[in-house]
């Protein structure tokens, strides 16, 4: 069977990366490509690298157009998905077959309406099934429950890119009770495509090249409640997780390198061999190199994640170590923000929801150097 897939927000970075993957997917046919501000233009004007779709005409982002497809992937700005998904739901309630909806934006990620209103300040659109198949649930050493939820879902919210990097870095230690979630510190080096395609003065070459720019400092970044939500799913007590989160834009187009520091719990400090206990938790969650999670690579001891190796891929690389002097654990994760951080996660969830092999059409290998 071949499924038709429409992409809303097709001219942006996330939409373009979704399309790049879908053009190589053997089980889907790319349908309508929509964008509110670019309707009537050729897709090739926005994504000249997508040669097979270059002559396709961008259509308006309207529910009636999107509803004609089996799957709709939304790659819209935060706050824009809620209205179009509500319109699609209304059409479905009228007897029309409802498409599988996959939202790459933030609108349906947060379970807490209070958290949404505090960080986003707009109307709450409700939570959908969370599109991180590798998310550990309390009591799990290998992710199964989230995959089961996705396989049964018709409404999926793709995680935030920074959220993915931080969650994958530390969740094994939270699930195993080895990390204290009350004093987590995350510093992320983030590529400029994470800021979107719209022109902004601080993103011009003259401002960005040769410069690192912190942003959303002091607990204001919108991904904080989403990370906390994930850590609570993994086993942190409700309200116990506290995260200091500082992202820094660095002069690269794609990529995230997350460095997360967490205090050791007594269980880890008092273990006969703390290093072995720590390594075992990550190995249980992700598997030794070449086994376990297909899209997460736990690196050999002494090797650290770098963004170049995951560029253009749907893979995450992770590593963990103990800082004895600080009595803390340092966990790191590198991803491509448009790959594992967005588009690959969307396609991975699409595959699960359609009953397909999870990694179909997802690029495993990076393109560096």
What are these regions (language model features)?
Residues 19, 167-171, 224-228, 279, ...:
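Predominant activation on well-ordered alpha-helical scaffold segments within soluble catalytic domains
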Residues 165-166, 270, 341-342:
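Secondary-structure boundary/capping motif
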Residues 330, 334-337, 347-369:
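C-terminal lid/capping helical subdomain adjacent to the catalytic/cofactor pocket in oxidative enzymes
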Residues 172-176, 263, 349-356:
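Active-site catalytic microenvironments for nucleophilic, acid-base chemistry
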Residues 21, 25, 91, 230, ...:
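Conserved short hydrophobic interaction patches
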Residues 249-251, 335-341:
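Glycine-rich phosphate/pyrophosphate-binding beta-alpha loops
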Residues 27-66, 75, 188, 192-331:
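C-terminal substrate-binding/catalytic lobe of Rossmann-fold NAD(P)-dependent oxidoreductases
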Residues 1-217, 321-324, 359, 365-369:
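N-terminal Rossmann-like NAD(P) cofactor-binding subdomain of oxidoreductases
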């Amino acid at each position: 069977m071949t499924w038709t897939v429409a992409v809303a927000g097709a001219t942006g970075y996330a939409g373009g990366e979704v399309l790049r993957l879908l053009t190589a997917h053997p089980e889907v046919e790319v349908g309508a490509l929509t964008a509110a501000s670019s309707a009537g233009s050729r897709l090739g004007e926005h994504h000249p690298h997508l040669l097979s779709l270059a002559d396709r005409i961008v259509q308006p982002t309207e529910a009636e157009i999107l509803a004609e497809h089996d799957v709709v992937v939304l790659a819209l700005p935060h706050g824009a998905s809620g209205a179009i998904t509500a319109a699609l739901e209304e059409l479905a309630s009228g007897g029309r077959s409802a498409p599988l909806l996959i939202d790459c934006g933030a609108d349906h990620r947060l379970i807490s309406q209070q958290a949404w209103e505090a960080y986003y300040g707009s109307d709450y659109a409700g939570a959908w099934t969370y599109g991180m198949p590798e998310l550990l649930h309390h009591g799990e050493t290998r992710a199964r429950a989230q995959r089961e939820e996705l396989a049964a879902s018709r409404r999926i919210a793709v995680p935030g890119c920074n959220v993915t990097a931080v969650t994958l870095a530390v969740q094994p230690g939270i699930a195993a009770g080895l990390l204290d979630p009350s004093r987590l510190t995350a510093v992320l080096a983030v590529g400029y495509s994470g800021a979107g395609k719209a022109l902004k003065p601080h993103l011009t070459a003259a401002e960005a090249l040769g410069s690192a720019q912190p942003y959303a400092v002091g607990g204001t970044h919108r991904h904080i409640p989403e990370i906390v939500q994930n850590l609570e799913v993994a086993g942190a007590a409700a309200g116990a997780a506290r995260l200091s989160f500082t992202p820094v834009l660095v002069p690269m187009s794609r990529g995230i390198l997350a460095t997360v520091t967490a205090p050791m719990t007594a269980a880890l400090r008092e273990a006969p061999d703390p290093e072995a206990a720590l390594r075992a938790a990550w190995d249980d969650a992700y598997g030794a190199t070449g086994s376990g999670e297909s899209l997460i690579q736990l690196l050999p001891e002494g090797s650290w994640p770098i963004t170049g190796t995951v560029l253009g891929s749907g893979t995450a690389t992770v590593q963990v170590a103990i800082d004895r002097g600080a009595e803390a654990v340092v966990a790191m994760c590198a991803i491509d923000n448009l790959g594992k951080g967005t588009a690959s996660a969307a396609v991975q969830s699409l595959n699960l929801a359609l009953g397909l092999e999870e990694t179909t059409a997802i690029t495993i290998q990076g393109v560096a150097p």
